[in-house]
Each structure stands twice: as structure tokens, then as C-alpha cells.
């Protein structure tokens, strides 16, 4: 965000929607004077708005920026969630829709018959995940309507910053636009 956008410019007023806000980002963005910052989550006490990502209580084309990191892998109907994200994003708006991804997989794997937490952890990487995304994730976002840039920032920043920010080497981040 710092390198590629005007997100941190005080003159650039942005309406931001942040799903399942991470503590470190929450504090930073809440104090950012140029941001009209709204957090949402179905369960988190940090959330300004308690909402289901598949049925958002916001008007169409409302947000300049949407941050949704490591949420979609928990959502049974991720297509509906992606459609809702697209709906509330303004034309020209930016969405960071990061997920855990297995780039060795061509296609996403989901199986809703797997309900045992230990089995989910083994297969999907965490007990409350309902799928493991493959390389087709970016195309799924495109099929919703997003323009997607696939960014590997770990190849563009110093190794010590990769370590500092706990980035996974080679992780591809979808930078999406409407």
C-alpha cells in the first residue's frame, strides 16, 4: 500500500472497509486521518459493523479500498462473498483479497463433507478452513469482475523486510480493482 498507492497520503481521502481487522493494521488505520475506516466481522468485538460477508449491509459502490486478508478460506460460499466485495467496491477501487494458497495446485480443493476439525487441519491447513486455494484463485476473482494483478512483493523488497513482516517467500498477493 505504501509503495504502490496513495493510501497513506493525508491528502488522499479514502473510504476503507476492513474485514476481520488484524490488530497491527487496526491501530494504524484507525489513526490515519485521511481514512474513513470501517471494520466488519461476524464475531470480532473490534468490528464496527457485525456483518455476514455474503450479505453485506452496505450500498453498492461505497468503498475506495477493501482489505480482506485470510477470510475467504473460512467462507462456505466464497463466490457469494466475492460478489458482495465486488458490489460494495467503487469503480476504480482497490481490494486486497489475500488467502492462503498452494501454488503447486492448479485448482482449488474444497469438500464440504470434511467436518472433523483434525481432518480439516490436515487437508486445508487449519481446523476452520473449508478449502485450500490453488492457482485458479486469481481467475475466479476475474470471473466475478475484478481486474487482478498478481504481485509477489517478496521478490521486490529486501529479505530483512520479508522476515520482519512475516511474508511467505513467493506468496502471490492479488491486488484487485473494479
Predicted regions and their residues:
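S-adenosyl-L-methionine-dependent methyltransferase catalytic module, highlighting the catalytic core
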Residues: 76-85, 90-178
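Cys/His-rich short segments
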Residues: 1
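Short boundary motifs at domain starts and secondary-structure transition points
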Residues: 5-10, 164-165
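A short SAM/SAH-binding and catalytic strip from SAM-dependent methyltransferases
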Residues: 64-76
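A short acidic, Gly/Pro-enriched loop at the edge of an enzyme's catalytic core
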Residues: 53-66
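Class I SAM-dependent methyltransferase SAM/SAH-binding core
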Residues: 8-55
Amino acid at each position: 500500500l505504501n509503495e504502490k498507492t496513495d493510501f497513506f497520503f493525508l491528502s488522499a481521502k479514502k473510504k476503507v472497509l476492513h474485514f476481520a481487522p488484524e490488530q497491527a493494521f487496526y491501530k494504524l488505520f484507525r489513526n490515519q486521518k485521511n481514512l474513513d475506516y470501517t471494520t466488519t466481522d461476524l464475531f470480532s468485538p473490534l468490528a464496527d459493523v457485525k456483518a455476514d460477508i455474503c450479505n453485506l449491509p452496505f450500498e453498492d459502490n461505497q468503498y475506495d479500498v477493501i482489505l480482506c486478508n485470510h477470510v475467504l478460506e473460512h467462507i462456505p460460499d466464497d463466490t457469494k462473498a466475492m460478489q458482495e466485495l465486488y458490489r460494495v467496491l467503487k469503480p476504480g477501487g482497490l481490494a486486497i483479497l489475500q488467502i492462503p494458497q498452494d501454488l503447486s495446485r492448479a485448482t482449488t480443493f474444497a469438500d464440504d463433507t470434511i467436518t472433523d476439525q483434525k481432518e480439516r487441519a490436515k487437508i486445508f491447513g487449519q481446523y476452520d478452513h473449508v478449502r485450500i486455494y490453488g492457482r485458479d484463485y486469481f481467475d475466479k476473482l476475474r470471473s466475478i469482475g475484478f481486474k487482478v494483478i498478481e504481485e509477489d512483493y517478496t521478490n521486490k523488497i529486501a529479505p530483512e523486510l520479508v522476515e520482519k513482516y512475516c511474508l511467505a517467500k513467493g506468496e502471490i498477493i492479488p491486488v484487485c480493482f473494479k
